[in-house]
């Protein structure tokens, strides 16, 4: 049976009630498998991954097997205490689907159910991926080897819900949709001492302040003004009391850039400046830059041009050309390995993603299912 709105909204509501942190999505996985297990199995092969044990892969065997189209959804939630007042609010204290991955999963199930009933022209691989929020789940999935061989897609698609777009609208653009991100963690070590004898100590408040100040020059003086880059240092701790010179400091922040080349350029400047501050202030700085799998989501030109043209010509789709977002998304790793397109699906919420009050409009679910079953059928037909 093809899942329709009357099926998918209760599925969404149940998923919303059982949010789980990345790599812990066992109840979510079991529920997804129960839904997938009720679909016609004639063309389906279901696979789990021992080294990524909450992931699910489903292959739909097409009429031909020399091309594969991939579709990915994320399945994890956030450590947020829900404040929506919904009758189907989270039953897991301190965890919430505040980023809409419950919407993502519901749409994916709807699309999968269609192709389980309507055999596609080519093979399709549906990926229910854990740990988008916290542990580079896309990279883990790819590097697990589970996609190797006849599970590896030739092209791949995914979406993210967008509270700033009208319900059901499809938003996309050529080029980068999401920025690549990189965590900055710097631990400074000097020598503590009495405030009355600064010459006998090595003050990490002063060294840390210099590091913060100098890192802020990167975007202003080392990044082409026509391109985009962000260096934000949101955490700086040092010292215990006002009359003791701090011998330790911790600085944490983030890099954002719309291309991987710019991200790497900024990372190099962070390293160089940090080395200079350590030398200038005669201290040790343990610098860790952690990008993981959070590469920029750079849409493939040819595939995305076809996606945009198709959506613009579909009278049932409200297509909106969007600007790049400086938020991160680990689909960036997958799309660097497999050409494809990511897009936005509007859910029209007054609250932002990651808000404890975020409530998407569920009418978007069928809009996403209908648009993507139609488009993926079109993509299949190109390779039959």
UniProtKB/Swiss-Prot annotation:
Pfam families: M20_dimer, Peptidase_M20
PANTHER family assigned to the protein according to its UniProt record, in alphabetical order: N-ACETYLDIAMINOPIMELATE DEACETYLASE, PEPTIDASE M20 FAMILY MEMBER
MF term (GO), any: N-acetyldiaminopimelate deacetylase activity
Described purpose of this protein according to its UniProt entry: Catalyzes the conversion of N-acetyl-diaminopimelate to diaminopimelate and acetate.
Family the entry assigns: Belongs to the peptidase M20A family. N-acetyldiaminopimelate deacetylase subfamily.
Protein name (database record): N-acetyldiaminopimelate deacetylase
Species: Lactiplantibacillus plantarum (strain ATCC BAA-793 / NCIMB 8826 / WCFS1)
Catalytic activity line of the entry: N-acetyl-(2S,6S)-2,6-diaminopimelate + H2O = (2S,6S)-2,6-diaminopimelate + acetate
GO BP term (any one): lysine biosynthetic process via diaminopimelate
Pathway where it operates: Amino-acid biosynthesis; L-lysine biosynthesis via DAP pathway; LL-2,6-diaminopimelate from (S)-tetrahydrodipicolinate (acetylase route): step 3/3
UniProt lineage: Bacteria, Bacillati, Bacillota, Bacilli, Lactobacillales
Catalytic residues as annotated in Swiss-Prot or TrEMBL: 74, 133
Known EC number: 3.5.1.47
Transmembrane domains' residue ranges: none
């Amino acid at each position: 049976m093809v899942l329709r709105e009357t099926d998918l909204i209760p599925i969404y509501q149940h998923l919303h009630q059982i949010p789980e942190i990345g790599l812990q999505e066992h109840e979510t996985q079991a529920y997804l498998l129960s839904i997938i297990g009720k679909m016609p199995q004639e063309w389906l092969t279901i696979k789990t991954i021992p080294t990524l044990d909450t992931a699910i892969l489903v292959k739909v065997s097409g009429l031909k097997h020399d091309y594969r189209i991939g579709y990915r959804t994320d399945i994890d939630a956030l450590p947020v205490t829900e404040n929506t007042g919904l009758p189907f609010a989270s039953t897991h204290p301190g965890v919430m689907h505040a980023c809409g991955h419950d919407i993502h999963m519901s749409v994916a199930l709807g699309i999968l159910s269609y192709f389980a009933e309507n055999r596609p022209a080519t093979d399709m691989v549906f990926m229910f991926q854990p740990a988008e929020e916290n542990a580079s789940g896309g990279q883990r999935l790819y590097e697990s080897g589970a996609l190797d061989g006849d599970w590896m897609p030739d092209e791949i698609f995914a979406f993210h819900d967008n509270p700033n777009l009208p319900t059901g609208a499809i938003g996309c653009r050529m080029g980068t949709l999401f920025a690549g991100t990189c965590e900055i963690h710097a631990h400074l070590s000097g020598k503590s001492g009495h405030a009355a004898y600064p010459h006998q100590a090595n003050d990490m408040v002063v060294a840390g302040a210099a590091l913060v100040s100098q890192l802020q020059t990167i975007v202003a003086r080392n990044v082409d003004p026509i391109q985009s880059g962000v260096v934000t240092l949101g955490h700086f701790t040092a010292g215990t009391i006002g009359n003791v010179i701090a011998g330790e400091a911790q600085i944490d922040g983030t890099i954002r850039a719309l291309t991987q080349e710019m991200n790497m350029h900024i990372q190099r400047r962070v390293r160089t400046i940090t080395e200079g501050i350590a030398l200038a202030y005669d201290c040790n700085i343990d610098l860790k830059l952690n990008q993981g799998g959070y590469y920029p989501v750079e849409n493939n030109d040819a595939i995305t041009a076809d996606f945009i043209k198709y959506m613009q010509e579909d009278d049932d789709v409200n297509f909106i050309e969007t600007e790049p977002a400086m938020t991160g998304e680990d689909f960036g790793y997958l799309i660097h390995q497999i050409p494809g397109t990511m897009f936005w699906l509007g859910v029209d919420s007054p609250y932002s993603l990651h808000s404890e009050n975020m409530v998407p409009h569920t009418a978007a679910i069928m809009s996403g299912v209908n648009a993507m079953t139609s488009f993926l059928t079109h993509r299949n037909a190109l390779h039959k």
